[in-house]
Amino acid sequence: MILHAIVPDAATAGWAAGNGASVVQLRLKDVPTAVRVRVGREVIASVGDLAMIVMNDDVAAAEALGVTVHLGQGDPGVERATRAGIRFGRSAGTPEEARRAEAEGALYIGAGAVWATPSKTDTGPAIGLDGLRAICRAVSIPVVAIGGVDASNAADCVAAGARGVAVIRAITELPRLRALLEIAVADSGDGRER
C-alpha cells in the first residue's frame, strides 16, 4: 500500500513520514533548482529511512539529491532521467498516457485528478473512479490516485484498483488514511502488497 504525501518543506515531510507516509514528494513551485536541492537535503535529513523521497518536476534536483523524480505529462526530463539512471513517476489522466508512461519506464503512475481539487489547477477534468479504474487496468505498474482524495474516499480508490493514494490538503489525515487503507487492502482479498 502506498501512502504518498506531497509536502512543501522538511518539517511537514518528517511529520508525514512519521505518521504513515511511505512516499514523501517535495513540491516547490516557481523556485530555482538550487532552492529545491537545499530544501531536498533538509527533507532527506528529516525523513531518513522512513519513506521514499520524490522531487516534483526537477530532474536536476533529483539527480543532485539521488532521489526519484515525479514528472507531469507536460514536464520535460524523461530522457534525462533515464540517461542518468534516475527513477521517475509520471502523471496520467487517461489509460493511453498511463501506457505511454509505463513504456517510458515509469516506476509508478499518479492518476487523476480523480476528483476536482483546489490544490492543483493545471489538470484536465476530473477522471472519477471509472477513469481511475481504466488507468489501473491499463498498466502493470503501481497506480496512485491523486486529486481530491481524503479519508472519505481513499478506500474507493483502492477498490478501483489503485495501489495507494496521494494527498496534499488531506495530509493531516495521514494516520486515519493509513488505517483505512489497511482495511481496504485486507477487504480486497487479493493478498498483494499495495
PLM region spans:
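Conserved N-terminal beta1-alpha1 strand-loop-helix module at the mouth
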Residues: 1-75, 80-108, 130, 134, ...
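A short acidic, helix-capping loop that chelates divalent metal ions and anchors anionic groups
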Residues: 26, 62, 115-121
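Short acidic/polar capping segments at secondary-structure boundaries
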Residues: 114-116, 149-151
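Active-site-adjacent loop and "lid" segments of alpha/beta metabolic enzymes
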Residues: 121-126, 145
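Conserved catalytic/dimer-interface elements of ABC ATPase nucleotide-binding domains
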Residues: 166
